[in-house]
Amino acid sequence: AGMVNICYCLNFPELPLQGNYDDTKYKIYFADSGLLVAMLDEEAQEDLRTSKNLGVYKGALYENVVGEALVKAGYKLYYYKRDDSTLEQDFFVRTASALIPVEVKAKNGTAKSMRTLISSEKYADIHCGIKLTGGNIGYSDDIYTFPYFCAFLLKRYLAGVNI
């Protein structure tokens, strides 16, 4: 009934996305991040509201907000987790000719898995990535950085650039 968004695990990060995922492996995100916050225990809610202390919830909340924005922009949700390593990517979006990993960073840090996906010849459909952080807009080493609140604009941005 539209309460959750399902994010399927890709078998391999390559195009096409449809038919390239395992429907038995998935993550579930709330379709409304406000409901997620409302379901937290009272102490955690108070901590969020009064002291803005996101604590252990920060990564999950930001990932949920970005997943919600991507769905509302018209994307289906996909992630990748390689079984034999620590390689994991939060989301993927696509253009007509490229697959673009999207990383949600709760803290400003390196996106190690994304760098591996971009630099390895095994992932031929991936040429650049998008990192969403609490920081400013930037570009370095084939990674475009945007503030979280720009997630809903990714589709429009990607339509206007040649990636």
Language-model features: locations:
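Domain-level recognition of nuclease-like catalytic cores that cleave nucleotide substrates
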Residues: 135-163
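Short catalytic-loop micro-motif centered on adjacent basic/acidic residues
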Residues: 79, 101-104
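Structural motif
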Residues: 98-102, 128
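Accessory nucleic acid-recognition modules appended to NTPase machines
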Residues: 1-96
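Catalytic cores of nucleic-acid endonucleases
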Residues: 106-146
